[in-house]
Each structure stands twice: as structure tokens, then as C-alpha cells.
């Protein structure tokens, strides 16, 4: 049971990083007025 929770937590963190990476880059460019 603990292993499943740990696996889900790792998958969630990986998905969060995958989604947050492009989002952070987009926000940085947006605040600079590049878009």
C-alpha cells in the first residue's frame, strides 16, 4: 500500500514538473513582453 502511494506521488511530481516547466518559461517570456 505504501509502495503504491509512493509510486503515485512520484508520478504526480513528474507530471507536475513536466507541466510546470513550459508554464514557467511561458510566464517568463510573457512578463518580458516577448509574446
Curated annotation (Swiss-Prot):
GO biological process, one term: photosynthesis
Entry keyword Transmembrane: yes
Keywords annotated in UniProt: Membrane, Photosynthesis, Photosystem II, Thylakoid, Transmembrane, Transmembrane helix
Annotated InterPro entries: PSII_Ycf12_core-subunit
Predominant location category: membrane
Membrane listed as a keyword: yes
GO cellular component terms, A-Z: photosystem II; plasma membrane-derived thylakoid membrane
Entry superkingdom: Bacteria
Subunit architecture: PSII is composed of 1 copy each of membrane proteins PsbA, PsbB, PsbC, PsbD, PsbE, PsbF, PsbH, PsbI, PsbJ, PsbK, PsbL, PsbM, PsbT, PsbX, PsbY, PsbZ, Psb30/Ycf12, peripheral proteins PsbO, CyanoQ (PsbQ), PsbU, PsbV and a large number of cofactors. It forms dimeric complexes.
Name under which the protein is recorded: Photosystem II reaction center protein Psb30
Species for this entry: Synechococcus sp. (strain CC9311)
Record lineage: Bacteria, Bacillati, Cyanobacteriota, Cyanophyceae, Synechococcales
Gene assigned in the entry: psb30
Amino acid at each position: 500500500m505504501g509502495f503504491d502511494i509512493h509510486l503515485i506521488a512520484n508520478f504526480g511530481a513528474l507530471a507536475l514538473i513536466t507541466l510546470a516547466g513550459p508554464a514557467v518559461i511561458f510566464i517568463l517570456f510573457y512578463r518580458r513582453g516577448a509574446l
